[in-house]
Each structure stands twice: as C-alpha cells, then as structure tokens.
Amino acid sequence: MFEIIQAVFSAGVALALLTFAGITLGGSVVACIISTPLFVIFSPVLVPATIATTLLASGFTASGSFGATAFTILSWLYKKRTGRDLPKIPGLTPPAPASNPAGSGV
C-alpha cells in the first residue's frame, strides 16, 4: 500500500514540475521575443559596456589574486628568515625511522 501512495504522490509532483517547466519555458520565449528588438537597438552601447565590465572585473580579480599570493610568499620568507616556521601538519610527513629496528635483536 505504501508503494502505491508513493507512486501516486511522485506522479503528482512530477506532473506539477513539468507544468512549471512548461510555464517557465513559455515565459522565457515571450521575454526573448519582447527583448530582442531592445537588444538590437541598444547593442552599440551594451556590447562595449559588457566588454569593459568584463575587463574591469578580470583586472580586479587578477590584482587581488596576485596581491594575496605576493603577501603569502613574503610572509613565508619572513618566517623562514626569522626562524619561525609555520606549524607542521600532523601526518603530512612520515615519522622518523626508529633507531632500534624490530628485527635487529639489540
């Protein structure tokens, strides 16, 4: 009985989601039909604005990344020079070999 209820509920949800998908697709087509003439009219402004915005965002991202990398390297160099190494991550390096191996019998 539980499987029947589950199947009916799943079919109802699937039907509702398909209905929403169809409504969304129809709305997207109507919006595309309405907005296409506006994009054609304003394209001499929109295309350069898009290019400028993309270049500006890429420049800020690259600048921030280079600055963060440089700061990390300078911080590492300073800690190396002053003898204050970063704490080691446990388990990252293998443990040192034992001075008395198990098979030596000593």
UniProtKB/Swiss-Prot annotation:
InterPro entries: Oleosin. Coiled coil: none annotated. It is a multi-pass membrane protein. The chain crosses the membrane at residues 14-34, 37-57, 58-78. GO terms for cellular component: extracellular region; membrane; monolayer-surrounded lipid storage body; pollen coat. Proteolytically cleaved following anther tapetal breakdown. Signal peptide: none annotated. GO terms for biological process: anther wall tapetum morphogenesis. It is found in: Secreted, Extracellular space, Extracellular matrix, Pollen coat; Lipid droplet; Membrane. One of its GO terms (molecular function) is lipid binding. Present in pollen (at protein level). Inflorescence-specific expression, especially in flowers florets. Residues 84-106 are annotated as: Disordered. Keywords: Extracellular matrix, Lipid droplet, Membrane, Secreted, Transmembrane, Transmembrane helix. It comes from the Eukaryota. Belongs to the oleosin family. Lipid-binding oleosin involved in anther tapetum development, especially for the physiology of tapetosomes. Also implicated in the formation of pollen coat. This is Tapetal oleosin GRP-19. It comes from Arabidopsis thaliana.
